[in-house]
Amino acid sequence: MAFEERIGQGGHILFWQPEDKFRINSKQILGMDLDWTIIKPIRGKIHPIDENDCEFIVKDTEISRIKHKIDNGYKFVIFTNQGGLLDADKNKSDKKMGLIGFKNRWVNIYKKLQEEHNIHSVYLIVSLYNDFNRKPCTGMWEFMEFQLNDNIKVQKDKSFYVGDMAGRKGDHSSGDLLFALNVGTQFQVPEVFYSDSKLSSNFTSVLIKDVYKNDKIFNGAKYIKEFDKNISRSNKKITDDITNILLDANTNNKQYLVLFIGK
């Protein structure tokens, strides 16, 4: 059980799978964010300072909700943006956890899930760069579905994604909500998932209104700029044009219709 990396057209993926006997392929996915959805720093900071700085965000009885889903046939996959790890490795003086610390921390988390909660079947997918794998872009989900699920078609309407960044007041982004919307799956925030509360029919609609009210609108221009590094020169003018449109729309509150036609 070691971390693996893939570099493809959509960018860079870091991922981890359990040993063979615990691997599951399923039509139904329980996707979750990692930080502040499953774990949090012990010392009260927003970001962990080392590999030992984490604890589960809820009590044991609530963590058992994850095992219940796995026992009912769900594939449990964690999708996490970790763009700060490489910056931390470059700036050692910042006292932030780097990539090696993150990997060691994950080993500690998985060991606790196994020993304390009897949860063995866990997949971890990590985005390290501002490319098409970074949430709310859908690259990590697509990698899971087409590379780690034996080509089984996922029933997105029966799957769901749980994350804390929902565009609410106090959330620093709406990335988790928008990730679920882009994927086309159901969305829950951690406090709803762990309490097994019934969702109102307009739950997502209310959150979307909060995204605009709290100015948590996603700016996709930086993702396309990052992706520019990996595309051919013949396609660069196209992405430059799209980037300018996104910047104009985001800055000046304009609306554009962009059609992408494949062949």
Tell where the protein language model's regions lie, with residue ranges:
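Non-catalytic pre-domain segments flanking phosphatase-related domains
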Residues: 1-34, 42, 194-252, 257
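Alpha-helical substrate-recognition element adjacent to the catalytic core
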Residues: 2-131, 252-263
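Residues at the starts of beta-strands that form the adenosine-phosphate
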Residues: 73-76, 158, 186
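Short, surface-exposed alpha-helical segments at coil->helix boundaries
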Residues: 100-107, 138, 174-177
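Acidic, Mg2+-coordinating phosphoryl-transfer loop and its flanking beta/alpha structural elements
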Residues: 160-203
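Hydrophobic helix-cap positions at the C-terminus of alpha-helices
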Residues: 66-69, 113, 144, 148, ...
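Conserved Lys-Pro-Asp/Glu-containing loop-to-beta segment of HAD-superfamily phosphomonoesterases
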Residues: 136-174, 257
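Short catalytic/ligand-binding loop motif for oxyanion handling, primarily in non-cytosolic enzymes
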Residues: 85-89, 132-134, 168-170, 196-197
